[in-house]
Amino acid sequence: MIKITTKLGCLLAGLLVLSACSSVPQPNNEYAKALDDTKQVCAACALVGNDLLVALNKSCDTPMTPETLTSVMNSNPMFAAMMAINSIGGTDFYQVYRDAAIDTLRCNEMDSWPDRTKERFQQPDMQKALALRVSARQQKAN
């Protein structure tokens, strides 16, 4: 009888822990919701904010949370530059510029990140990448 009671108690305790854990929102779910909410208000903001935060997460271990997404959009100097590029330059230009931004990311030097990115973007290999993207898109259209 004691064995059955102990096993039943352990099973109930385990189920209680699992149900408690499943009811706590996971950071990924919270982030996805924040990103979706941002998309509804400003799709370009969500695109640029997410692209920058993904790069910061990979290179600088910046957590992917609603708070860091908001912080990137409000205070990261690259956000305004990337928003301008996205709205003026179109998809091809934006994607190559984003790649240049990723290449020049230095975790402790955020203030000079836009200048480094601009210099990197002007390099011949980046200009060639842009030309190839534009050419490929034009060929698809024809």
Tell me what each language-model feature is:
Residues 67-142:
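Compact alpha-helical subdomains of small soluble proteins
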Residues 17-20:
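C-terminal motif of bacterial Sec signal peptides marking the signal peptidase cleavage site
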Residues 29-88, 105:
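Short N-proximal segments of mature Sec-exported proteins
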Residues 4, 27-28, 35-36, 75, ...:
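Intrinsic-disorder/low-complexity regions
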Residues 1-11:
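Bacterial N-terminal signal peptides that target proteins for export
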Residues 22-24:
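Bacterial signal peptide processing site
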